[in-house]
């Protein structure tokens, strides 16, 4: 029997079978040992084969080949990865310029990982109703930056419903992963898109100005127009997994494009003479914040923070 994984609690998986049943499944112990160094070898969005037992329980015994997935280093700094979701048509990264602030380094790490696994990303700038004039100017500068690179952007207020209809329309016929820091209003936005869903929402810690986790597992929801949303727990950081140093620049489209003009083919864009990328940064043709994010990821590689895939 085949089906789609629509929920993952860490201990069991809910599968919607091709004939419309909803079945809770486990994975067999030996399935975990098939060379998959991941905290969750089965992810929401996976197409799977399941076997029903006489006792009424079910096991996942096979995962179909994935079209793509979004992966990050496991938060416990082990040699394992964590797969956020699989078989995606797009991601929507929900970000805020304050309450809490989403750093450009976090945004760029997420974008680079999505580029590596060929998942299109759109940026959703939430809480536009809460910002002062300086924050709104900064917001517009970020939108100008990322739109120019090629990432579509939305301005929304999930709380007031502003801009939500444009996102709804963009979800039609697609499987979309929603991700972002805790506290950016991701769950509030999903509730605005799907009023009957009642995804749990949380408050902001006033001491740290950071969000508190409300979603504790990944889950898929149906949306109008034959689409699906995958809601994931809020993430604090985005440790990139299985990237070689020389590949990192490939996942920054504007850096990769300019790097063709570097004097040396193996230029790291840090100190080499004749570096077209550094020249473009100095001329403000490449954003300094994006270049900083690129260097930050190179530093991770040097410090051994990247993990090899197994």
Curated annotation (Swiss-Prot):
Keywords (A to Z) from UniProt: Cytoplasm, GTP-binding, Hydrolase, Metal-binding, Nucleotide-binding, Ribosome biogenesis, RNA-binding, rRNA-binding, Zinc
Domain CP-type G as annotated: residue spans: 77-238
GO terms, molecular function: GTP binding; GTPase activity; metal ion binding; rRNA binding
Cofactor: Zn(2+)
Residue sites binding GTP per the record: 126-129, 180-188
Broad class of where this protein is predominantly found: cytoplasm
Positions bound to Zn(2+): 262, 267, 269, 275
EC number(s) per entry: 3.6.1.-
A Gene Ontology term for the protein's cellular component: cytoplasm
Tree of life domain: Bacteria
This protein's record includes keyword Endoplasmic reticulum: no
Function: One of several proteins that assist in the late maturation steps of the functional core of the 30S ribosomal subunit. Helps release RbfA from mature subunits. May play a role in the assembly of ribosomal proteins into the subunit. Circularly permuted GTPase that catalyzes slow GTP hydrolysis, GTPase activity is stimulated by the 30S ribosomal subunit.
PANTHER family linked to this entry: SMALL RIBOSOMAL SUBUNIT BIOGENESIS GTPASE RSGA (PTHR32120), SMALL RIBOSOMAL SUBUNIT BIOGENESIS GTPASE RSGA 1, MITOCHONDRIAL-RELATED (PTHR32120:SF11)
HAMAP family: GTPase_RsgA (MF_01820)
Protein name stated in the entry: Small ribosomal subunit biogenesis GTPase RsgA 2
Provenance organism: Bacteroides thetaiotaomicron (strain ATCC 29148 / DSM 2079 / JCM 5827 / CCUG 10774 / NCTC 10582 / VPI-5482 / E50)
Organism placement in taxonomy: Bacteria, Pseudomonadati, Bacteroidota, Bacteroidia, Bacteroidales
Gene it is expressed from: rsgA2
């Amino acid at each position: 029997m085949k089906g789609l994984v629509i929920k993952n609690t860490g201990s069991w998986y809910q599968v919607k079978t091709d004939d419309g049943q909803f079945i809770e499944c486990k994975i067999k112990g030996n399935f975990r040992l098939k060379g998959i160094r991941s905290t969750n070898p089965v992810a929401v969005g996976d197409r799977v084969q399941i076997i029903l037992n006489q006792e009424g329980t079910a096991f996942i015994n096979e995962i179909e080949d994935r079209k793509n997935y979004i992966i990050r280093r496991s938060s416990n700094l082990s040699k394992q990865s964590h797969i956020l979701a699989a078989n995606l048509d797009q991601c929507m990264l929900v970000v805020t310029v304050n309450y809490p602030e989403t750093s450009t380094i976090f945004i760029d790490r997420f974008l680079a990982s999505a580029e590596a696994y060929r998942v299109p990303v759109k940026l959703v700038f939430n809480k536009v109703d809460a910002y002062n004039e300086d924050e709104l100017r900064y917001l517009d500068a970020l939108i100008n930056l990322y739109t120019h690179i090629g990432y579509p952007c939305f301005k929304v207020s999930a709380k007031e419903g502003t801009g939500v209809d444009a996102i709804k329309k963009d979800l039609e016929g697609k499987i979309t992963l929603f991700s972002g820091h805790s506290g950016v209003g991701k769950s509030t936005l999903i509730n605005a898109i799907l009023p009957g869903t009642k995804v749990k929402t949380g408050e902001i810690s006033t001491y740290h100005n950071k969000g508190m986790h409300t979603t504790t597992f990944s889950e898929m929801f149906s949306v109008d127009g034959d689409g699906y949303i995958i809601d994931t727990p809020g993430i604090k950081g985005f440790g990139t997994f299985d990237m070689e140093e020389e590949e990192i620049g490939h996942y920054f489209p504007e850096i990769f494009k300019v790097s063709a003009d570097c004097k040396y083919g193996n230029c790291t864009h840090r100190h080499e003479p004749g570096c077209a990328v550094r020249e473009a940064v100095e001329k403000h043709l490449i954003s300094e914040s994006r270049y900083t994010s690129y260097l930050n990821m190179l530093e991770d590689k040097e410090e051994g923070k990247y993990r090899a895939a197994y």
